[in-house]
Amino acid sequence: MDRPIDDIVKNLLKFVVRGFYGGSFVLVLDAILFHSVLAEDDLKQLLSINKTELGPLIARLRSDRLISIHKQREYPPNSKSVERVYYYVKYPHAIDAIKWKVHQVVQRLKDDLDKNSEPNGYMCPICLTKYTQLEAVQLLNFDRTEFLCSLCDEPLVEDDSGKKNKEKQDKLNRLMDQIQPIIDSLKKIDDSRIEENTFEIALARLIPPQNQSHAAYTYNPKKGSTMFRPGDSAPLPNLMGTALGNDSSRRAGANSQATLHINITTASDEVAQRELQERQAEEKRKQNAVPEWHKQSTIGKTALGRLDNEEEFDPVVTASAMDSINPDNEPAQETSYQNNRTLTEQEMEERENEKTLNDYYAALAKKQAKLNKEEEEEEEEEEDEEEEEEEEMEDVMDDNDETARENALEDEFEDVTDTAGTAKTESNTSNDVKQESINDKTEDAVNATATASGPSANAKPNDGDDDDDDDDDEMDIEFEDV
C-alpha cells in the first residue's frame, strides 16, 4: 500500500473513532495504529489500565470490525508455554465496516423522513394514530364538537409532522456535513488499491514498544527457537536513507521473522543462468531417456534373437564358433567377413543388449504361446466334459423313456392276460361240465352193456375171455367217438 493511501486510511480510522466513539477507544486505536501490532500485555502497560477495563473496549472495536486479533502459543526460554494475543488492524475490513455503518445511519434518517413527510391532518395523542381530513369528518362527535379517536375515544389534535419533518431534515443535513470528510476519504480509497494487512505484514511494519516486553512478536514461533531482539543484527548498508533504514524499521525487522531478499542481476547474467539451466535439463533428459529397445518392439525386426529362420552374419559369434571348432587354436581360413570393420565396444554392448532383450522377448512369446495353448486345451477339455455330461443326460432320459414304455406295455399285457385268463377259466369250466356229462353217458352205456351180456356170460363160461376182448374194443371205439 502506498504511503499516501496508508495515511488516508489511518486518518479515516482516527476520524471515525473520534467522531462516533471517543474516550478510551481513541487511545486504544491510536496505540495500535502507531505500533502496527501490539500484544495485550504491552497495550495494558501503555494505557495503564487493567484487563477488566481493556476487555469492553476491545470487544466493542472488534464487534465493529475496526481491529482484529491474532492468538498464538509461544515458548519463552526457561519457562512454560503461554498463549499471547496480538491486536492489529485489517484495513480492508475496517474500511468496509465504516462504509456499512455510514450507509445504515443515513438510510435510517432518510426512511424516517420519508415516512413522516406527508402530514395526515389529525392524530391521536394517546395511540398516535393518524387520520386524514376526510377520515376525521366521520369521527366528529356532535355533542362534544370534537373529533374522537376510533380506538381510544380521545380527542384528536392537529398533526404537526411538518414541523418535525423540518427538524429531521435539518438534522440529516447537519449529519451529512459532519460525515462529509468520511465520504471524501472513502472516495479516495475506492480509487486506489488497498492491500490485505495480515498479521505477517503488520509484523514487518512493527514499531516495538519502549518497555521490557515478554512478547515474541513472531509468527508461529517453534519450541526452542531463538527470539529476535532489537540490536541483534546490524543494519544493511544499502538500506540506509530509505524507508527501511530508519531505527523503527530496523527494530521491527529484528523483532520479527520476516526477511527481505534482494537479488540484482543483469541481462547477461540472466542469459548465462538460462543456458546453465537448459544444459542441466538436457543432461537430466539424457540420463532419464528410455532406451530404443524399450520404445519399439524388436521381436522379428533385429538380427539378434529373431524368431524367423533367417540367419544374419555376426563376426564375433562366427569367430568364437571357429575357435571352438579348431582345438589347436589354428587360425581359421580367411572369409569374406574378415574384411569388415572391427566393432567398437559400444556397438558390441548394444548388440549384446539387443540379443539379451530379444531372447527375453522370445522366451516371453513362447511362454505366452504355451499359456494360450494350455488355455485352449483346458477349454477343449471343458467342452468335451460338457458334451459327455449332455450325452449322459440324454442316455438317462432315453432309459427313463424306455422304462416308462415298458411299464406301460406290462400294464397293458397284464390287462390282456387277466382278460384271457378269465376267458380261459370260463372255457375250462364249460369243458369240465361237458366232460362230466360225457363221462356220465359213457358210464350209463357201459352199465347197460354189462347188464345185457350178463346171462350169456353165465351160460358160456369158456368163451368169456374172447367176448370180453370184443366188448373192450367196442367200448374203446365208442369212447373215441364220444
UniProtKB/Swiss-Prot annotation:
Pfam families: TFIIE_alpha. Residues 274-295, 321-482 are annotated as: Disordered. Residues 374-401, 464-482 have a biased composition (Acidic residues). It is found in: Nucleus. GO terms for biological process: transcription by RNA polymerase II; transcription initiation at RNA polymerase II promoter; transcription open complex formation at RNA polymerase II promoter. The keyword Ribosomal protein does not apply. Keywords: Metal-binding, Nucleus, Transcription, Transcription regulation, Zinc, Zinc-finger. One of its GO terms (molecular function) is zinc ion binding. Residues 274-286, 433-444 have a biased composition (Basic and acidic residues). Gene3D superfamilies: Zinc/RING finger domain, C3HC4 (zinc finger) (3.30.40.10). A zinc finger (C4-type) spans 124-152. One of its GO terms (cellular component) is transcription preinitiation complex. It comes from the Eukaryota. SUPFAM superfamilies: Zinc beta-ribbon. Residues 321-345, 419-432 have a biased composition (Polar residues). Its main location: nucleus. Residues 9-99 form the HTH TFE/IIEalpha-type domain. Belongs to the TFIIE alpha subunit family. Present with 35900 molecules/cell in log phase SD medium. Recruits TFIIH to the initiation complex and stimulates the RNA polymerase II C-terminal domain kinase and DNA-dependent ATPase activities of TFIIH. Both TFIIH and TFIIE are required for promoter clearance by RNA polymerase. TFIIE is a tetramer of two alpha (TFA1) and two beta (TFA2) subunits. This is Transcription initiation factor IIE subunit alpha. It comes from Saccharomyces cerevisiae (strain ATCC 204508 / S288c). The lineage of its organism: Eukaryota, Fungi, Dikarya, Ascomycota, Saccharomycotina.
